Structure formats: structure tokens, C-alpha cells
Amino acid sequence: MSASRGAVIWMTGLSGAGKSTLANALHQRLMEAGHAAIVLDGDVLRRGLNADLGFTPEDRTENLRRIAHVAALFMQQGFVVIAAVISPEHRHRCSAREIVGDGFIEVFVNAPLNVCEARDAKGLYARARRGEIPHFTGISGPFEAPLAPDVVIESDRMPVDESVDRLLAHLAAMGRPGH
């Protein structure tokens, strides 16, 4: 696969919206079709590459800047990069798009807050509501819905397989690895 054929699928949405589930399902389908693909999961990266960062506005900006640069490096090698990151602010997503350049696809994985809370197996929303987690996106921290995402996935209404099909079709329409 040529370097010009890589892409970065930047999945944004609240915690519990289904970003990681969708990212892993898309990754599996891409790999089965013989495409080079990688998932950059925000939670995983925060435990490793970005373990030195907290959740202050400055640290969130740096976290997403690093992820965008890593994503761009993989894309330049022809990978389809699936970044599953909350990226709560419009400016963060604009910055990521600028860093990545051509091949950036913003995907809004949307689900109502009550659905995200119901899916929360770790109890993070409950802890945030008790004030135990400051700056928690959607509770004590803002989430700015994307203004013009390339793709919107309503994860509470659309099955994962159908969502993957929609993303693969979008990739194919862009001339990127897909079907």
C-alpha cells in the first residue's frame, strides 16, 4: 500500500459513546481485508506514551497533539489509523486535522449522555458526579460537539457492523483502503 493511501479516522465522542468498540471492529475488518491498520486508543495511550500528563487543559492539548503526530507517522507509512479519543474541544480536533493533513477523517461517535452513563462499567460517570474526578468530560468538563464531522455514527441507534460498513464506504469514496 502506498503512503498516499493511508488515513486517520479520528473518532471523537463522550466516554462510553462506543469509540473503542467501533475502532476495534473497524480494525478487525480492515485487517481481514489485508489492509495495514492500527488502533490508537486514548485510554491505552494515557497509560503509556502519555502517562506523564494529567487532565488540565494544557495536558489535554499536549495529549492530543502527541496522538495526532503518532497517527500522522503511521498514516505516512500507509496505515489506516483509527484514533479513539474523546478530544472534547473543537480546537483540539482542528489541530489534529492540521497535523495530519490530507487523509484526516473526523468521526463523531454520538450517544446521549444517559446511554454513555449506562454503558460505564468502570463507574467513572458516578465518580465524576460525586466530584471525585475533576474536569470529567460531559459532567464537570465541556464536550463541544463537532461542527462539521465527516461522518456521524449514532451508536445508540446503529449496530456496530452497520457503523463499520458506513466507515468503510467513506474510506472507499475517498480512495483510501476500504472494501
From Swiss-Prot:
Gene3D superfamilies hit by this protein: P-loop containing nucleotide triphosphate hydrolases
Cellular component GO terms, alphabetical: cytoplasm
UniProt entry keywords in alphabetical sequence: ATP-binding, Kinase, Nucleotide-binding, Phosphoprotein, Transferase
Pathway(s): Sulfur metabolism; hydrogen sulfide biosynthesis; sulfite from sulfate: step 2/3
UniProt KW Protein biosynthesis keyword: no
Binding-site list for ATP: G13, L14, S15, G16, A17, G18, K19, S20
Listed GO MF terms: adenylylsulfate kinase activity; ATP binding; sulfate adenylyltransferase (ATP) activity
EC number: 2.7.1.25
TM annotation in the entry: none
Catalytic activity, as annotated: adenosine 5'-phosphosulfate + ATP = 3'-phosphoadenylyl sulfate + ADP + H(+)
Keyword Metal-binding listed: no
Protein origin, superkingdom: Bacteria
Catalytic residues (UniProt): S87 (phosphoserine intermediate)
GO biological process annotation, one example: hydrogen sulfide biosynthetic process
Pfam families: APS_kinase
Family: Belongs to the APS kinase family.
HAMAP family named among the record's database cross-references: Adenylyl_sulf_kinase (MF_00065)
Function summary: Catalyzes the synthesis of activated sulfate.
PANTHER family named among the record's database cross-references: SULFATE ADENYLYLTRANSFERASE (PTHR42700:SF1)
Name of protein: Adenylyl-sulfate kinase
Species, as recorded: Paraburkholderia phytofirmans (strain DSM 17436 / LMG 22146 / PsJN) (Burkholderia phytofirmans)
